[in-house]
Every structure is written in structure tokens, then in C-alpha cells.
């Protein structure tokens, strides 16, 4: 395949080995100017220390570090949370939700510097290549896209380190890297190493944020979440921005070992992969939101919201954020959440986040109607006629079968 004619490219840069190699590789193979773009999505301050200097030492002409933490939580995580989306019943979509906000900001930097191409460091086996390039296609169809992992012949960390050493480019990466990790404000994922065999139990070093539930405090801790229109607006009586609320709950949940999952998932590209995911704050938020929904949503609305969550989980996971269907689904979920207002107390103990108290001014739960004791507001004899009509189709089918 012939190479594209490129003048200036913006590369999504992390400071790791792969993207440190990509910058000089782009200059050598495309004879172009390279601008580095770093997305701060809450992966940790330690990951950003000296990153501009690293990028320029690798050959970038400029490096832009963009703070996307609040935007990620407010505009991507919260709308997804309202749908109740779990991918394949367990995964809270941590990596999936971060990719579109990163891609959007990368396109904005490309427009700012007058670039004619975009570059990502995703491998040809994973989901992220589809997520990034799908976003690029929706937001900047005129820009060219370069995916080095689908072009170059570097196949090992040793080769990548040698590549940098030959060019006197400094890199602190080690030859051995046991795990592949991805972190943002919502979660951290761990893949590879011992996890490549499904018969191996995760080692303790497969977990980064959360305490082993067995080693967590013996005394439970309680957190109180205030929910307005399906969003957490305050925790323990203090108003917080979406990002700050998540940081606070991450700290509380991690201390008690909340939010660990070990799953085998179906990747978009067809293969299965295994990962250990930690989402402490997100797990607490989801439990609290679900508790208020149980009070507020009627049966058919709750069922519909469940359907929205299932579809949303696949759209987000599959890299279809910038599509009319994703927007429509989340608009519907947002409408359903207008009355999802309430207060929830969550107990954190030994890996569990358990709702112990919940209330809402919009609650459809009525003690007078739900009581199992003496009943003054509900005439139980009315149920007979309802049941006869409700089961009419079954009755007719049975009568027909007897003919």
C-alpha cells in the first residue's frame, strides 16, 4: 500500500514506548511535521510529569496537553450512566467512553495547527482503532489517518527500544512489561500476563486502585449521594462537580475494594479478551442511580430504560458515539431521568456497595398501597377482574387447543 502524502500530523501521545517510537517513525516514513497531543482524562498526574519534554525529545515540533477530565465525566460518562449501560452485563465501559472525547479533542488540535492528518497508536487487534477512526470519520472525514501498528514491522518491545536507542531518543520504558493498562477518571484496566490464561486466577498485582476486599477495613463506611435528573450532584452533603464527585467516590470505594471485575469480553474485531477492571466510584454511582430509578420509574419506563442501556452499551463499546442513534438513545434516557431525583445511602464493605436507604420526592412507592397489613386504600377483590383480562389470551389459546 502506497503511503499517504502528509505535511503535518497530530498524534495522540501518551508518553509510553509505543507513541515515543511513533513520532520519529512518522517523521522518517512520511517526511512530515509531527505535533503531539496529550489527553488528560484523569489517568494520574504521575503520567503527565515531563510529558511535553518527552514528546519534543522524541521529535515533536509542539505538544498540546488538554485537560478533558470534567468533559469526560459530564458529557460522556454521565449520559452513558443514565442509560444504565453495562457491556455484556458487567463492564462499565471505562475505556470505551474515553475514546470519543480524546478523538474529538485531537481533531480540534488538528484544526488549530492546520494539520492534514491524524495518527493513533492502537494495535490492529483491538477495539480502539475502530473507536478512534470511527470518530475521525464522523468529525473530520477530510483528514488522513495513519495507524503505524498496521504498517510497521516492529513486533516487540525490544525492537522498539532498539529503534529509539539507535536514534539517541531517551525512553524510560523497560524491556519487560507484564501487563497492558489503560486508566482514566472512571476506571483502570489490566490485561495480558497471567490473565492470558482463563484458568489462572488474577495475581494481586493485576489490581492497581482497589484494596483486596479480604484486606479491606472490618468496619463498614457509608456514603450519601444526592441525585438530580439522573446525575450525582452532591456527596456526603457537599455539592461537587461531576469529576470531583467521581474522584471522591473512587477514593472511598477503592479503600473498601469496591468495583473489581474479572471478565472475558467479546471484542468488536471478533476475538475474545480477558481483563481485570476496577471502577470503584462508578460502581457506587450506578448502584445509587438504580436505587432512585426503582422508586421513580413506572414499570414500562423502567423496562424501556433497560432496553436503552443494552443498546447504548453496544454503541459505546463499538465506537459509534458520534451517530444519530447514540444521540437519540441518550436523549430518551435523559428524558426518563427528569424525575430521577433523590437521596441514597450506600454501604461500602469488603468489596460490596450496598444501598441501605433511599428516598425521593418523586417516588411512586406508597406504603399505604404496598403494606402487607390491614388495607384501607386497595380493594383486593378488584384484582380478580384484572387477572381475568390479563390472562385472556392464554385462556383462549388453551380453549382452542381443547377443540
Swiss-Prot record:
PANTHER family: ARGININOSUCCINATE SYNTHASE. Its EC number is 6.3.4.5. SUPFAM superfamilies: Adenine nucleotide alpha hydrolases-like (SSF52402), Argininosuccinate synthetase, C-terminal domain (SSF69864). The keyword Protease does not apply. Belongs to the argininosuccinate synthase family. Type 1 subfamily. Gene3D superfamilies: Argininosuccinate synthetase, chain A, domain 2, HUPs, Single helix bin. HAMAP family: Arg_succ_synth_type1. This is Argininosuccinate synthase. L-aspartate binds at residues 123, 127-128. The keyword Nucleotidyltransferase does not apply. GO terms for molecular function: argininosuccinate synthase activity; ATP binding. Keywords: Amino-acid biosynthesis, Arginine biosynthesis, ATP-binding, Cytoplasm, Ligase, Nucleotide-binding. It is found in: Cytoplasm. One of its GO terms (biological process) is urea cycle. L-citrulline binds at residues 91, 96, 127, 131, 180, 189, 265, 277. Homotetramer. Pathway: Amino-acid biosynthesis; L-arginine biosynthesis; L-arginine from L-ornithine and carbamoyl phosphate: step 2/3. ATP binds at residues 12-20, 39, 121. GO terms for cellular component: cytoplasm. It comes from the Bacteria. It catalyses: L-citrulline + L-aspartate + ATP = 2-(N(omega)-L-arginino)succinate + AMP + diphosphate + H(+).
